[in-house]
Amino acid sequence: MPHTHSRHGSSGDDLCSTDEVKIFKDEGDREDEKISSENLLVEEKSSLIDLTESEEKGHKISRPDHSPVFNKLDTHAPSFNMGYLVSPYSYANGSPSGLPVTMANKIGLPPFFCHNADPLSTPPPAHCGIPPYQLDPKMGLTRPALYPFAGGQYPYPMLSSDMSQVASWHTPSVYSASSFRTPYPSSLPINTTLASDFPFRFSPSLLPSVHATSHHVINAHSAIVGVSSKQECGVQDPTTNNRYPRNLEAKHTSNAQSNESKETTNDKKKPHIKKPLNAFMLYMKEMRAKVVAECTLKESAAINQILGRRWHELSREEQSKYYEKARQERQLHMELYPGWSARDNYGYVSKKKKRKKDRSTTDSGGNNMKKCRARFGLDQQSQWCKPCRRKKKCIRYMEALNGNGPAEDGSCFDEHGSQLSDDDEDDYDDDKLGGSCGSADETNKIEDEDSESLNQSMPSPGCLSGLSSLQSPSTTMSLASPLNMNANSATNVIFPASSNALLIVGADQPTAQQRPTLVSTSGSSSGSTSSISTTPNTSSTVSPVTCMTGPCLGSSQERAMMLGNRFSHLGMGLSPPVVSTSTSKSEPFFKPHPTVCNNPIFALPSIGNCSLNISSMPNTSRNPIGANPRDINNPLSINQLTKRREYKNVELIEASESKTIVAHAATSIIQHVAVNGYHANHSLLNSNLGHLHHQLNNRTENPNRSEQTMLSVSNHSVNSSECHKESDSQAIVSSNPPNAGSSDNGVISVS
């Protein structure tokens, strides 16, 4: 590909014209490069002969008068009188320019002349009194550096004696800054050459320098023209010019290193001891040559197969010979190498030990950045952090990235950065699987979902059946929470009134060790159906809410208020009655109270053998579609949206006799037991009902008591009132007058 090179204008425009374009061509430099590398030895020998001849001629040549040519330089002098090297106008078509005829004949160049048409018959002297360069191997100059370029980059294979003489004339003072004082500004950068730079500056392409700075210094016309376009087109790294000696040095060093490595490997292979041959190997060694001679096969695998077949065809007597030989081989081997073991030939064990050592050393440093899977492996998942077990982000890795140490207190972080303790991580698992914060206590889950208690499996938050949020640790307190109970264990009995009015009757028990039982019944507007849920107030089945240690003032009113707040959204609808219990042992519906005389209203006798078991009752509640069945606080459950009913407003109930209300409540309980198929003694229930009526007649004889009995009906809340306690252990019925806005659901609070 032809390269065009435009001449650069210099400060002295009168020296030459600046409109000339030189075109150079690259011709087959790759092929000639191989030839030149083969001819290097011949060229080096001939160059030594030429150098000796040029030294002799250099001493004979006289110095002309214009020795101070660099200090008193004529402005029209071409190229600082360096035209003896190359004319600034070397034409591509071979037009005449100035070199001496003798020199041109020797190197095959057409004679050329300088600008003033004065042929340089005699070369200039060694400048500034410095003797000519002696290109001798003793000077430390490497001889291959005379030919740094490939043979294809210049058409002439080697320097003649005269051109070698030209190379010997120029000393480093040629390029000194003091030599170019007059015609060029001092700001022009000038390179001074060293002895190591000199050989490649005078290359066979006749370039004094390939560097751009000295390139401008030597010639005002942008370059002393060379044949290679690669030399013209940019600054070349000196390492490329010196590539022959440096490559040789690199080869020597690489060869030395390879030899050393081979020696070390040989040293390692020397102690390798082969294990003794067994019987079959001895047979193969003996018979292999015969099989190869008989068969034309050359593959060793096929030969081994043939030998194996023949070995199995041998009789025991023939094989025993080889077994005897193998035994002798082993004995000889043991005598030669007493401490030898076959494990020495296999480096797996040593490699394994090495890996373990490397791991132990890197554990202190780089292994902290690894995740638990990479650090401990799949076999030790117990040591993984909790997020790694869930295939989440490793907290140890994240803490190592953040510069913090690994969490040592056993706590970990979830995806959102909230810290989880070890106690909360199981709950965290359940919440991630679909549980909610409003669901029941998940630590004591019942495995059979059909036998789950009503506290855990109620689908609708708006259902009256079963008091759907008995154990929900939500903002509104549940009935079964210890916060809602007095310190003295009181039995709370909830009866449904005829129009969704709830009556809370509290009876003080003499012994605080008895477990309080909560019986909750709820019925529809007709009062025909109701559901019963007995929940023992134990620490394992109730929500972990802070328990009240002492009896508080107005505790019954607070219970009523919480109950009213809990069922403030009962206008949504009712689900089918569900009977559930959280206890499997038989407990009476109502505990017998021995102190009947101290009971303010009544004490219900126990109903015998009435244990309620969930397994005997059909689970009529269905799980809502698209919502978690345990999520009782979900306002968009299916039952709530599809079973919306309009309830009749409950008017204010003013009953002067509590006998009828309690009787209706007891009747509804018996009715509910009969409808749902409880195996209870109905005659016992009837007798208990008669006993209840008798007690009510005795209690309602006092007119003062009956006048003070009032029913408080509220829609969304029951106002708190003070709890009056008398010294004779008889509780006084306290109630508040109803609010003007109370309409829907009534709650009767009696303590």
Curated annotation (Swiss-Prot):
One of its GO terms (molecular function) is DNA-binding transcription factor binding. The keyword Transcription applies. Residues 1-53 are annotated as: Beta-catenin binding site. GO terms for cellular component: beta-catenin-TCF complex; chromatin; nucleoplasm; transcription regulator complex. The keyword Cell division does not apply. Disruption phenotype: Flies exhibit a segment polarity phenotype and altered expression of the wg target genes en and Ubx. Residues 46-70, 233-273, 349-371, 406-477, 514-545, 695-751 are annotated as: Disordered. Residues 699-721, 729-751 have a biased composition (Polar residues). Residues 457-474, 516-545 have a biased composition (Low complexity). A motif (Nuclear localization signal) lies at residues 351-357. It holds the Pfam family HMG_box. Residues 54-66 have a biased composition (Basic and acidic residues). GO terms for biological process: canonical Wnt signaling pathway; embryonic pattern specification; heart development; imaginal disc-derived wing morphogenesis; mesodermal cell fate determination; negative regulation of DNA-templated transcription; positive regulation of DNA-templated transcription; positive regulation of gene expression. It is found in: Nucleus. Residues 421-430 have a biased composition (Acidic residues). Residues 273-341 bind DNA. Keywords: Activator, Developmental protein, DNA-binding, Nucleus, Repressor, Segmentation polarity protein, Transcription, Transcription regulation, Wnt signaling pathway. CDD domains: HMG-box_TCF7-like. Binds to the beta-catenin homolog arm or to gro. Segment polarity protein. Functions together with arm to transduce the Wingless (Wg) signal in embryos and in developing adult tissues. Acts as a transcriptional activator, but in the absence of arm, it binds to gro and acts as a transcriptional repressor of wg-responsive genes. Belongs to the TCF/LEF family. This is Protein pangolin, isoforms A/H/I/S. It comes from Drosophila melanogaster (Fruit fly). The lineage of its organism: Eukaryota, Metazoa, Ecdysozoa, Arthropoda, Hexapoda.
